[in-house]
Amino acid sequence: MKIKTGKGTVTLAVLLAIWSVSAIASLPGLAISPILGDLNKIFPKATDLEIQMLTSLPSLLIIPFVLLAGKLSVGRDKLKILAVGLSIFFLSGVACLFARSMMWLIVISCILGIGAGMVIPFSTGLVVDYFTGDYRVRQLGYSSSINNLTLVLATVVTGYLANVDWHLPFLVYTL
């Protein structure tokens, strides 16, 4: 099946890949939310500062890597940069499943923030690259809808998973 882009067509597989990047862009930080209230029980020696760092440092690291990925993608192979970002995001999400200390969880979450920062610019950037005119506007709307729908569904899923085991919400990063 071919999808019109305004400058030609793309396959359905390419469109689904673009949409999947939009889905991932909403996930950073999501797994921490359902376990935030329990972190003092999970890690009794954790300080309030460490808990605050766990929620803020990954988001802070997203900012420079969004800028860096955007800058690097000009005149370079965007898909390679995206693949590196997705790999970092996925592998750090898996590593969170095995975290045994607050410091380890903070470090892994920071690495996850780096990967997310490399992925986020492509959630709309790929749409802009592949589509023009009304086709672009429509796809940007779909991208935004997918991003928000993923956020809602993943929030519900991570909440349920947190009731089973505090590690399980991190599975959301392996999508």
Where are these regions (language model features)?
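Extracytoplasmic
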Residues: A13-D48, A69
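Residue-level signature of the transmembrane alpha-helical cores
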Residues: V21, L82-I88, S92, I108, ...
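Small-residue-rich segments within alpha-helical transmembrane domains of MFS-like 12-TM solute carriers
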Residues: S26, L30, L97, G113-P121, ...
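Residue-level signature of mid-helix packing/kink "hotspots" within the transmembrane helices
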Residues: L30, P58-L67, L151-V152
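Conserved MFS/SLC helix-loop-helix module at the cytosolic interface between two early adjacent transmembrane helices
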Residues: P64-M103
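Cytoplasmic helix-loop-helix junction between adjacent transmembrane helices
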Residues: M102, I108-N147
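Helix-loop-helix hairpin linking two adjacent transmembrane segments in secondary transporters
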Residues: Y142-L175
